[in-house]
């Protein structure tokens, strides 16, 4: 059995945790540079505020009550996500962080001590008391069914945020799947759901009853796996340690166009610093650092310019100082005066789990002494 814990309205809820005065008030979180709405509290949803609504439009709209908007704070959201993960690990033996606000739990055998849904309510209370955040919990014999149960726990308030689909209650599972649109199934996107609809498959139950071989032939092995999971056959295992990333990218569009080298250098250094921090979080070292800059392709009255340069290091590193220095060298090669830059970023790749490298006899470059200890202090 698997459980899926999903934090309700995660970004908006994180902002509310530290502002008790905002309880029961509509809150939205905006994208980078306050471009558009990327998260809404339940109160904001009830006002009809849509995802992706531009901030300038929202600001001019009239509502019965004031809508409070926050700029996105990803450091806060990552910290709160880690706190939720810690609290779940205190009650479940194995936990996989699927996304910043979703975690899968292995709950096999727990029903010998406590009812599955009672355990789900226990999880909710433990996380709420420890973090101030509310989670929904869906449970099932496969990850896909746990995801469907979690969807239903949100869709119908009478479940109280907790729903278990057990192998012993097939009728309940079939009833839920008959009510779940095929586009709401985990891993079924809009394009695939449209093709399924043309075949007369509009609900999760209809997909579950489809022939797996037929699905594989007409779609792919991934959707075949989904069909098997909907029938209670576990095909997707828990990943306690997700595979290491192959690339880290830190970039951002500028709120105002950048026209000076010093302002661009400062932005690139910030991106490089954040990328180095993420690299250490992955417990990886990198050998390849790239920087890109570009103007806006939509500014038709201005000449477009975009370029990228990279630096390859002799010794893999995760030291912020090395990564910033390489990023600045790359920036110096692509910077051109006279442009109004709209975006810049830093990319790291060519990862290795250690900082060890075979050096040439005549190489003068040596690893920095006590670098690891210094970076640990920097990361706090």
Predicted ranges, named:
Residues 109-110, 141-146, 294-299, 349-354:
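Short, internal active-site loops enriched in acidic
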Residues 184, 194-340, 356:
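DNA-contacting surface of Y-family translesion DNA polymerases
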Residues 98-102, 140-143, 284-288, 339-343:
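Short Gly/Ser/Thr- and Asp/Glu-enriched loop/turn motifs at secondary-structure junctions
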Residues 134-136, 290, 345:
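Residues at or immediately flanking beta-strands
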Residues 1-228, 238, 277, 365-380:
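Gly/Gly-Pro- and Ser/Thr-rich, intrinsically disordered tail segments characteristic of DNA damage-repair
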Residues 322-379:
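C-terminal hydrophobic structural anchor segments
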Residues 103-109, 308-314, 357-363:
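Short, hydrophobic beta-strand segments
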Residues 28-30, 70, 106, 227, ...:
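Residues in well-ordered beta-strands of folded domains
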């Amino acid at each position: 059995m698997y459980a899926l814990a999903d934090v309700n309205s995660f970004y908006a809820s994180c902002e509310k945790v530290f502002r008790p005065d905002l309880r029961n008030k509509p809150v939205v979180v905006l994208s980078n540079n306050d471009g558009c709405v990327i998260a809404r509290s339940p109160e904001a949803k009830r006002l009809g505020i849509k995802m992706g609504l531009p901030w300038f439009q929202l600001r001019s709209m009239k509502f019965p009550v004031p809508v409070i908007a926050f700029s996105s704070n990803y450091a806060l959201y990552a910290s709160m996500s880690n706190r939720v993960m810690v609290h779940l690990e205190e009650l479940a033996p194995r936990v996989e962080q699927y996304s910043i606000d979703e975690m899968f739990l292995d709950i096999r055998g727990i029903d010998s001590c406590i009812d599955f849904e009672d355990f789900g309510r226990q999880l909710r209370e433990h996380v709420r008391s420890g973090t101030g955040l509310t989670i929904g919990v869906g449970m099932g014999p496969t990850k896909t069914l746990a995801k469907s149960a979690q969807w239903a726990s949100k869709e119908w308030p009478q479940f109280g945020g907790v729903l278990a689909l057990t192998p012993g209650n097939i009728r309940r599972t079939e009833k839920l799947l008959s009510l779940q649109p095929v586009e709401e199934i985990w891993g079924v996107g809009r394009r695939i759901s449209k093709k399924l609809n043309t075949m007369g498959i509009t609900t999760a139950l209809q997909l579950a009853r489809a022939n797996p071989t037929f699905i594989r032939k007409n779609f792919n092995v991934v959707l075949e796996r989904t069909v098997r999971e909907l029938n209670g056959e576990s095909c997707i295992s828990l990943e306690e340690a997700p595979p290491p990333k192959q690339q880290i990218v830190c970039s951002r569009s500028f709120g105002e166009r950048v026209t000076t080298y010093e302002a661009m250098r400062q932005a690139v250094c910030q991106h490089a610093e954040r990328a180095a921090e993420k690299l250490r979080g992955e417990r990886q070292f990198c050998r390849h650092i790239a920087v890109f800059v570009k103007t806006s392709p939509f500014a038709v009255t201005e000449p477009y310019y975009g370029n990228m340069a990279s630096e390859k290091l002799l010794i893999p590193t995760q030291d912020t100082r090395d990564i910033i220095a390489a990023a600045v060298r790359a920036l110096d090669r692509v910077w051109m005066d006279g442009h109004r830059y709209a975006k810049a970023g830093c990319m790291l790749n060519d990862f290795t789990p250690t900082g060890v490298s075979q050096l040439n006899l005549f190489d003068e470059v040596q690893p920095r002494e006590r670098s690891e200890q210094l970076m640990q202090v920097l990361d706090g």
